[in-house]
Amino acid sequence: MKIYLVGGAVRDALLGLSVKDRDWVVVGSTPQEMLDAGYQQVGRDFPVFLHPQTHEEYALARTERKSGSGYTGFTCYTAPDVTLEDDLKRRDLTINALAQDDNGEIIDPYNGLGDLQNRLLRHVSPAFGEDPLRVLRVARFAARYAHLGFRIADETLTLMREMTHAGELEHLTPERVWKETESALTTRNPQVFFQVLRDCGALRVLFPEIDALFGVPAPARWHPEIDTGIHTLMTLSMAAMLSPQVDVRFATLCHDLGKGLTPPELWPRHHGHGPAGVKLVEQLCQRLRVPNEIRDLARLVAEFHDLIRTFPMLNPKTIVKLFDSIDAWRKPQRVEQLALTSEADVRGRTGFESADYPQGRWLREGWEVAQSVPTKAVVEAGFKGVEIREELTRRRIAAVASWKEQRCPKPD
């Protein structure tokens, strides 16, 4: 029996990154030997065991054979004669097909070290094309390591295109698509994930609402980058700098979906694209089974992002109504989330990346003023039933009006 550290732990250690999870491959053993040594078996489809002390995963070396469609259509074979090289060959990328023995020596049968040095994401073998999930995984790795200068090898991107055109991605379940997307949204450069999907044709298959934005022009005066698809990825990049929250990043990604519905004869203007985009947000989220909280914020951002940008022109009643519409009284975090997504929208434009965004500050300040109006004082004043709500709203409007007069500049 020989045990090797494999995969991401080896890769990230070589890149000088922190290692979170460690996976091990066991060569020359059997399930019974593992059980006799005190390991606990957890894998149903193939033998995976938990170490009795560390609870890290130890998998018997195995090979895989395509036996059906999609990413689940594989038959696994494991036996003591399966070699380490056999096991590593089934992995997706060469940089993930590295192993380390107990002496610290790196085993590299597929030139993963060379590709690490050259910052290349390259598939190990043609078997890559048998698993459509790998298209998303490579896009996610490209996003995860973009800051280190990684790029996808030309032959791997070509294979990803062939897989997409062959309809392989249609076998992916919504849950797996969302899981990979959610992971990509946590990376430093989530926009790279969607750009890679577009480069291989997968964006049109998995995110048609986003793909439809490319080639749709916006007024050059407000959007020097012109293309709405490019603007969308720029805003996502900016959102990633402003917030680590997946819901903020996803909502930013979806903020302009309504522009994809504008008839070409009306370009480059997109009047009413915010409310129009709400249905597309709902459509996308329902298809991918996006969690409700993330979906709800994306809907609100699509509907109200343009309104927040015009904050100095809003009257106090509209401002308080906005807080009502986003349910800020029960979910105050939404004010900050909308401020961040709106800022990402404004700064996600060519030449505006470092622009100040006072509207975000005013939105936050206006909220602090409105929510500081005490409900208790209204009740003690003798108001009852529905009158309490009406009087509280009136006092909030008055407070916001007073604040706005002093702090928020009047529009020209």
From Swiss-Prot:
Magnesium is required for nucleotidyltransferase activity. Nickel for phosphatase activity. Mg(2+) binds at residues 21, 23. It catalyses: a tRNA precursor + 2 CTP + ATP = a tRNA with a 3' CCA end + 3 diphosphate; a tRNA with a 3' CCA end + 2 CTP + ATP = a tRNA with a 3' CCACCA end + 3 diphosphate. Residues 228-329 form the HD domain. It comes from the Bacteria. One of its GO terms (biological process) is RNA repair. CTP binds at residues 8, 11, 91, 137, 140. It holds the Pfam family PolyA_pol_RNAbd. Its cofactor is Mg(2+); Ni(2+). One of its GO terms (molecular function) is ATP binding. ATP binds at residues 8, 11, 91, 137, 140. Comprises two domains: an N-terminal domain containing the nucleotidyltransferase activity and a C-terminal HD domain associated with both phosphodiesterase and phosphatase activities. A single active site specifically recognizes both ATP and CTP and is responsible for their addition. PANTHER family: MULTIFUNCTIONAL CCA PROTEIN. Belongs to the tRNA nucleotidyltransferase/poly(A) polymerase family. Bacterial CCA-adding enzyme type 1 subfamily. Catalyzes the addition and repair of the essential 3'-terminal CCA sequence in tRNAs without using a nucleic acid template. Adds these three nucleotides in the order of C, C, and A to the tRNA nucleotide-73, using CTP and ATP as substrates and producing inorganic pyrophosphate. tRNA 3'-terminal CCA addition is required both for tRNA processing and repair. Also involved in tRNA surveillance by mediating tandem CCA addition to generate a CCACCA at the 3' terminus of unstable tRNAs. While stable tRNAs receive only 3'-terminal CCA, unstable tRNAs are marked with CCACCA and rapidly degraded. Monomer. Can also form homodimers and oligomers. This is Multifunctional CCA protein. The gene is cca.
